[in-house]
Regions:
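Extended, low-complexity, charged alpha-helical tracts
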Residues: 2-278
């Protein structure tokens, strides 16, 4: 796809969002329907495959974020609807759900930063949207949450956002999303904490500090949504340790030291056994 075609698609998505929001004044409601409809129309009318198809999705997300910003909407708060609408739209043309979650979550973070929006809030919303969509589409909620988490953590690093704050927000998004769809929060918390560590390792970040932030986020989120705080802390810590142990024994020990003990007033107990390097 040419650069001119990219600009046209971004402009079309932006225009559609602006008109829809002006017409109903409901940013959240307009987002899901407009982005879903735009993608169905665009993707059904193209022969694009693979990377080009992914590019079309990213351009649509970019235009949507720009549209929300233009009408004065809070881009961070709109992230959930953007991810949900994108996944509903791409479902109609058979694009893989997890691939779409990854590319969409990444595009949301990048576009949010470009318009000066709240990247941390966008990260939370992207994960929530991925979980809600996964429930609708019959995909593993834990895999969806982990995929979105990996994408937003890497995205936050790429745009220079504070990864620690993003990590905490992601865990809040996991707990709120699983509560909304009635899913097992502990599995998703553990999976997302693991994804945080893997993404942080890939970007050269501080694994011990990030692991602790993940546990702090799980604790804060558990209190907010009314689930067992100790279990949530344990799930996050165990997920982080398992992922770190897959990198190396020394990294696993480093992360374990960071998350064992009392964090945010909660005694963190690890779910044994966790994976160790031979």
């Amino acid at each position: 796809m040419s650069e001119e075609q990219n600009k046209t698609l971004i402009s079309a998505a932006k225009g559609g969002i602006v008109e829809a929001i002006k017409g109903v004044g409901d940013v959240a409601g307009a987002l899901v329907d407009v982005i879903s409809g735009t993608l169905v129309k665009t993707l059904q009318g193209t022969r694009a495959v693979g990377a080009e198809m992914t590019g079309l999705v990213k351009d649509t997300v970019t235009g949507t974020v720009q549209g929300v910003a233009e009408v004065g909407g809070e881009v961070g708060s709109a992230a959930k609807g953007i991810v949900l609408g994108t996944l509903r739209g791409t479902k109609e043309v058979g694009i893989g759900v997890l691939d779409t979650i990854s590319s969409t979550s990444s595009a949301v973070i990048k576009s949010t930063a470009e318009v000066g929006g709240d990247v941390v809030t966008s990260a939370k919303g992207a994960v929530e949207g991925a979980i809600v969509a996964a429930k609708e589409l019959g995909v593993s909620i834990t895999e969806a949450a982990s995929t979105a988490t990996n994408a937003v953590i890497k995205g936050a690093h790429a745009v220079g956002s504070e990864v620690g704050h993003t990590t905490k927000a992601v865990l809040v998004g996991v707990c709120q999303g699983t509560k909304e769809v009635g899913a097992n929060a502990m599995e998703a918390i553990s999976g997302s904490a693991s994804a945080v560590i893997k993404a942080t390792a890939d970007t050269g970040g501080d694994l011990a500090s990030t692991a602790k932030k993940a546990v702090e986020g799980a604790i804060a989120a558990a209190k907010e949504v009314g689930i067992d705080v100790t279990e949530a802390a344990s799930a996050a810590a165990t997920g982080a340790i398992n992922a770190a142990g897959e990198i190396s024994a020394s990294v696993g020990a480093q992360v374990r030291d960071a998350v064992v003990g009392t964090i945010s007033g909660v005694k963190v107990v690890i779910q044994e056994p966790f994976k160790k390097e031979p």
